[in-house]
């Protein structure tokens, strides 16, 4: 690779390359107040297209999983987008639960056009209330009393005839039969007259036994007549019941006629009304209430209470009421428990026993969203495993079955009911992270069958004119909706630049709008304190500084350790086998760069590169891989004509918490080359970058934090104008450095070099060209590669002689044999 003496000048970045400054001069607005509120979302074309496909496919299984990071606006957008689709779709039906009069453990579901359920409930209630009075009035009417009197006369006549027959037989045994309130009773006679109590008590044993014997004979001979009396009594009761039912049926049918005509097109309503009328007629006696009985007998109060409870069977449960909707529902369930999703059966406790009926059936989000769209957060529903399983079962079965979970875990028994399942026709949208999606896709068998559409939200968007304007409109919308001060144009530009810094890419904007909105809220408090009408760029900068100040306690503690010399680091001078590497530390909300001294010792041996971090189990697998790549590079570069025989121990000094990643692999390689060649490295320059076996520099992460971290240390120890950072050229697009660092570069007090190959880096660090392999297979004398190659020959020379001696000994042994 050809390298000239101006390589530092060629590879040094200009100040304008360190950050892309947003200019809004082409836009006509002065503040975000001049802009319309954003409609839709910034970017996310892929996610929007997938969402559109999923929402418009109405087949089973085409539910949607929205994968994106929290704070990206995914939930708000999905909610709004679903509503935009739903507004063109019809309002689903109302649902009413009613008692199943054929099977008291079941309930029936009645579906009606939206808004009709309340009307049905009101009219059924009015009809029942009217019937309770109307039936009572009819059953105290002269018509009813006359009909009942005729039945009673016939009953008495038949009873009298049988009674006369009984007395004929009774006279033979000195007994007489009389009608009483308790029925027909037998009375012993004495001289043809009813026996008095005194006469009864004075009976001798013989007389008593004789009377007893006569009574038994009479009982046998009169059995048929008593059966006749019982049949007469039964016929009487049946006649009264028939009278009541006949009259009741006529009254009920007449009073339900109008209601039946009104709902004649709804078969489920007509079917229910038929069963309702039949049940009323069947229990017509419950409607015939004698208020005098209650007044005369206080104990009848309890019976009256039970009677009132009886009429609960005719009430209706307004299960789903869509009367207020104008289109298909969009339900966002924030607490998707089993009951909140699939509904529940509540209960009352009487004497320690749980009781329930159809009136206590409560709907769930699936019922309210039926015919439309249900939105839930994955983290919420997966934290309720019963709810997740219940949702999947409902989607697979295409119906919602309401069950009471509490009965399985309660010490009380509960009256059980079985609500009729509701047919399910809706679209479910689950919002989660990509990680949750992959877990479900790999480990949940039903997930792929039920959620066939994935809407993938990016973490970043292109930084183009369209999205910049969208960002400004988002800011306008957020300020307007939350009654905050609007932003001046320079404040918007500042946020655009910070948005790029959040994703460490000049060509991108963050999709994490929650952070942007939080900054606006905080900046508004500063603007309020300063009594300005709008938020300006200074307010944004102060906010960012305050946010960093809140979270950088650990970083400041690290800086103090560098300042007082606890951490050893040279930012000037030159040393052999020592170099400053760069790492990124994170405390959750805050990430920052921390320089680390890396040292290498080389000596004779065959161990190759000894990674001390690995030996003490302080390095991760990726870092270990990076170190092994170094051996590959050295072998590729210097061991084509000889064995690579040397030992180099490499360590991150004063590192006690472990290390992971390969971003320091090029840094380690420079230190090895310096140690082997015996050439000093400029300690003013810190290095970051990965390297492959061919010496090509590869990009890394956290470039802004690393550069700023080393800059802060140099500032602490004193800027000299020679300090800087060497980085991969591929990371130039990721540079969004703070203005302070950019100004230092502009003033010539700090430098940043972007390289693509190890040969470029070693020349910048040592001032000596790397040297390219010539035609004779040698490196030019005086170059780094020449010095390294010569030293490796020297380190491996004893091993070569030893190998030759061993070969001679083997040949001598063969000749002796």
Model-found features: residue ranges?
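Peripheral, non-AAA+ core regions of ATP-driven protein-machinery
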Residues: 357-366, 372, 378-385, 389-391, ...
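Conserved ASCE/P-loop NTPase catalytic core
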Residues: 2-441, 446, 452-464, 468, ...
């Amino acid at each position: 690779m050809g390298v000239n003496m101006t390589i530092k000048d060629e590879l040094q970045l200009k100040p304008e390359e360190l950050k892309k400054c947003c200019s809004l001069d082409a836009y006509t607005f002065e503040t975000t107040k001049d802009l319309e509120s954003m409609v839709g979302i910034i970017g996310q074309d892929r996610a929007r297209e997938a969402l559109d496909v999923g929402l418009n496919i109405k087949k089973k299984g085409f539910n949607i999983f929205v994968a994106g990071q929290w704070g990206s606006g995914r939930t708000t957008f999905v909610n709004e987008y679903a509503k935009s689709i739903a507004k063109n779709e019809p309002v689903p039906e109302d649902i009413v639960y009613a008692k199943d009069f054929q099977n008291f453990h079941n309930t029936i579901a009645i579906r009606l056009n939206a808004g009709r359920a309340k009307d049905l409930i009101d009219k059924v209630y009015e009809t029942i209330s009217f019937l309770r009075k109307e039936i009572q009035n009819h059953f105290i009417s002269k018509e009813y009393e006359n009909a009942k009197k005729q039945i009673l006369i016939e009953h008495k006549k038949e009873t009298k005839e049988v009674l006369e027959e009984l007395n004929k037989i009774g006279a033979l045994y000195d007994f007489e039969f009389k009608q009483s309130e308790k029925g027909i009773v037998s009375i012993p006679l004495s001289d043809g007259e009813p026996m008095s109590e005194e006469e009864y008590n004075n009976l001798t044993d013989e007389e008593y036994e004789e009377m007893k014997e006569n009574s038994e004979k009479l009982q046998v001979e009169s059995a048929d007549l008593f059966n006749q009396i019982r049949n007469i009594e039964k016929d009487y009761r049946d006649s009264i019941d028939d009278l009541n039912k006949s009259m009741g049926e006529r009254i009920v049918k007449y009073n339900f006629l109008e209601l039946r005509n009104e709902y004649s097109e709804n078969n489920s309503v007509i079917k229910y009304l038929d069963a309702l009328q039949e049940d009323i007629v069947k229990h017509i006696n419950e409607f015939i209430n004698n208020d005098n009985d209650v007044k005369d007998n206080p104990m009848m109060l309890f019976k009256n209470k039970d009677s009132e409870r009886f009429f609960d069977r005719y009430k209706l449960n307004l299960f789903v009421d869509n009367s207020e909707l104008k289109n298909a529902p969009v339900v966002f369930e924030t607490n998707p428990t089993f009951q909140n999703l699939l509904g529940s059966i509540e209960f009352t406790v009487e004497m320690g026993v749980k009781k329930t009926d159809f009136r206590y059936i409560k709907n769930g989000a699936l019922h309210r969203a039926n015919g439309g769209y249900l939105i839930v957060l994955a983290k919420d529903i997966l934290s309720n495993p019963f709810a997740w399983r219940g949702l999947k079962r409902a989607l697979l079965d295409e119906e919602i079955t309401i069950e009471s979970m509490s009965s399985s875990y309660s010490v009380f028994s509960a009256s059980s009911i079985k609500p009729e399942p509701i047919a399910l026709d809706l679209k479910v949208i689950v919002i989660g992270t990509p990680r949750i999606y992959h877990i479900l896709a790999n480990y949940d068998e039903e997930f792929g069958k039920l959620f066939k559409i994935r809407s993938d939200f990016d973490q970043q968007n292109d930084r183009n004119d369209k999205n910049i304007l969208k960002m400004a409109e988002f800011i306008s919308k957020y300020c307007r909706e939350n009654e905050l001060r609007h932003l001046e144009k320079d404040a918007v530009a500042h946020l655009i630049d910070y948005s790029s810094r959040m994703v460490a890419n000049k060509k991108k904007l963050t999709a994490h709008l929650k952070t942007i909105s939080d900054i606006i809220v905080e900046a508004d408090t500063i603007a309020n304190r300063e009594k300005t009408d709008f938020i300006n760029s200074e307010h944004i900068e102060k906010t960012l500084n305050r946010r960093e100040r809140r979270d950088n306690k650990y970083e400041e503690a690290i800086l103090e350790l560098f300042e007082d010399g606890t951490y050893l680091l040279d930012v000037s001078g030159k040393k052999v086998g020592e170099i400053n590497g760069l790492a990124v530390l994170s405390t959750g909300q805050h990430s920052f760069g921390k320089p680390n001294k890396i040292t290498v010792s080389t000596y004779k041996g065959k161990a190759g590169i000894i990674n001390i971090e690995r030996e003490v189990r302080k390095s991760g697998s990726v870092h270990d891989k990076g170190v092994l790549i170094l051996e590959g590079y050295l072998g590729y570069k210097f061991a084509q004509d000889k064995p690579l025989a040397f030992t180099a121990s490499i360590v991150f000094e004063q590192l006690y918490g472990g290390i992971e990643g390969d971003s320091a692999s090029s840094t380690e390689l420079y230190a090895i080359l310096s140690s082997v060649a015996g050439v000093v490295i400029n300690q003013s320059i810190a290095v970051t970058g990965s390297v492959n076996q061919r010496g090509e520099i590869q990009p890394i992460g956290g470039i802004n934090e690393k550069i700023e971290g080393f800059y802060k240390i140099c500032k602490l120890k004193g800027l000299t104008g020679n300090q800087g950072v060497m980085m991969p050229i591929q990371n130039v697009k990721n540079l969004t450095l703070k203005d302070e660092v950019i100004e230092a570069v502009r003033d010539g007090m700090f430098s940043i070099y972007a390289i693509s190959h190890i040969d470029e880096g070693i020349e910048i660090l040592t001032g000596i060209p790397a040297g390219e392999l010539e035609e004779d297979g040698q490196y030019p004398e005086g170059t780094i590669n020449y010095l390294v190659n010569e030293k490796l020959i020297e380190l491996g020379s004893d091993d070569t002689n030893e190998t030759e001696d061993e070969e001679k000994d083997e040949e001598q042994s063969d000749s002796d044999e």
